[in-house]
Amino acid sequence: MPEQGPRMNGFSLGELCWLFCCPPCPSRIAAKLAFLPPEPTYTVREMEAPAGTAQPPREEGSGEPAACSLHLSERADWQYSQRELDAVEVFRWRTERGSCLGCMFVRCSPGSRYTVLFSHGNAVDLGQMCSFYIGLGTRINCNIFSYDYSGYGVSSGKPSEKNLYADIEAAWHALRTRYGVTPENIILYGQSIGTVPTVDLASRYECAAVILHSPLMSGLRVAFPDTRKTYCFDAFPSIDKISKVTSPVLIIHGTEDEVIDFSHGLAMYERCPRAVEPLWVEGAGHNDIELYAQYLERLKQFISHELPNS
């Protein structure tokens, strides 16, 4: 999987003062600490209708034609053939806060019951993740739906905590409206910063399951590991929302995570009322859990044997 970004802690005293005192509000903390959008690795173009035919209808809420084509740059590190690329569906969808998001549907397993709504890390976009999605979906027998946060890839707007929550809300409704996938067939998967919108959405909607890959308790607890409570100026307070999640939750974390300490995964697990057996990957860091065999083994076990499949 592509690199998910540099360390979030280990700042100097001066840097920490700048982060949290100019002024100490969650949106500024979030923007300074968490969002590192790369230069876009893809473009989305409207597909022209054949001569003599009408333009395709516009999707309600998207503001864009239904049919678009995906064009990847060299930095996307595409690992498959044109046939797989042609099977990737892309479109744009508008959020309630006005951003127009790039969205992607990877039909890896047409006969599968489940679709994974994947919220990626803080330093990648859909172009970089596309190959990973195809490989993951094929191996766990699920289709993959993903989106770029505001200010990432082709998505308009700027990354912020409020936009993060609005973005996944829009993605949820796009998946349900455009593809007719019902909540009991949706698995929410968040990785790193992607666990933040995932927990927020899961605390408000019930779904088939939730997977939290290297989750964080809150922004302040990442920068200040000794923080024991959530302050009013903290950002991303997932630790206070996880108790409201009513769906089964699988938590995955590397014991040697150098970005979001392993203690975050443990704390989220202990606070979660519907947690299943977690996956603690001995020796894994923040960006290499997918390279360990037990990663796919645990996902397959969870989806194929611990969730309903009839």
Swiss-Prot record:
Topology with respect to the bilayer: Lipid-anchor
Superkingdom of this protein's organism: Eukaryota
GO cellular component labels: dendritic spine; postsynaptic density membrane; recycling endosome membrane
Pfam assignment, any one: Hydrolase_4
Classification via InterPro entries: AB_hydrolase_fold (IPR029058), Hydrolase_4 (IPR022742)
Active site, renumbered: 192, 257, 286
Record PTM text: Palmitoylated on cysteine residues located in a cysteine cluster at the N-terminus which promotes membrane localization.
Keywords, comma-separated and alphabetical: Cell membrane, Cell projection, Endosome, Hydrolase, Lipoprotein, Membrane, Palmitate, Postsynaptic cell membrane, Synapse
The keyword Transmembrane helix appears for this protein: no
PANTHER family documented for this protein: ALPHA/BETA HYDROLASE DOMAIN-CONTAINING PROTEIN, ALPHA_BETA HYDROLASE DOMAIN-CONTAINING PROTEIN 17C
Protein name: Alpha/beta hydrolase domain-containing protein 17C
